Amino acid sequence: MSEFSYVHTRGWVEVVVGSMFSGKTEELIRRLRRAEFARLQIQVFKPIIDKRYNEMAVTSHDLTTIDSTPIHDAEEIWNLLKPNTKVVGIDEGQFFGQNLVQIAQDLADRGLRVIIAGLDTDWQGKPFEPMPTLMAVAESVTKQHAVCVVCGAPASRTQRTAGGDGQVLVGTHDAYEARCRQHFKPEVDAPTLDWKLKREMEIS
């Protein structure tokens, strides 16, 4: 089940995961907008390190936006939560600590609908906590897919094409590409190739 109809007396956790460029944030915004149409009070949070498009808004790669509050730690949600809030949205969940798991469950136990979007694996193809644990405890998990830049197949992995070997590197098209299993090469210095030319060479 990808999306629940809201029941006012119950809370739950929804998780939206996938590679970069798979539409995770767009899906998060869509669900939050639907909640607004239903006249439910929403609050949206994002990690303060995510300043790629707009520091004060959750923004998808196609520049769809929704106002948000940047925070350092998920624990800050408790001090910022408004009494009439019914739906909490959290983007880039992988950039928060493991305490996000318990906070999400505590919010749901209070009757709130919690929607969290984030990467389920990092640039090395390894589980990107806390998202895998959130997937395990959530009532609903949606796995989004991008399009592989090499062959056009559904892409479930994020290829880093530039910058350091740390797990966290905030970036967009300048540092990452979506890849399928076959074309995923988790080397930090993997170059961005002319894939159209490469495919033509393979065919000829």
UniProtKB/Swiss-Prot annotation:
Zn(2+) binds at residues 148, 151, 180, 183. GO terms for molecular function: ATP binding; thymidine kinase activity; zinc ion binding. Keywords: ATP-binding, Cytoplasm, DNA synthesis, Kinase, Metal-binding, Nucleotide-binding, Transferase, Zinc. One of its GO terms (cellular component) is cytosol. It is found in: Cytoplasm. Its EC number is 2.7.1.21. Gene3D superfamilies: 3.30.60.20, P-loop containing nucleotide triphosphate hydrolases. ATP binds at residues 18-25, 91-94. Its main location: cytoplasm. PROSITE patterns: TK_CELLULAR_TYPE. GO terms for biological process: DNA biosynthetic process; thymidine metabolic process. SUPFAM superfamilies: Glucocorticoid receptor-like (DNA-binding domain), P-loop containing nucleoside triphosphate hydrolases. The keyword DNA-binding does not apply. The active site is at residue 92. Transmembrane segments: none annotated. HAMAP family: Thymidine_kinase. Homotetramer. Belongs to the thymidine kinase family. This is Thymidine kinase. The lineage of its organism: Bacteria, Pseudomonadati, Bdellovibrionota, Bdellovibrionia, Bdellovibrionales.
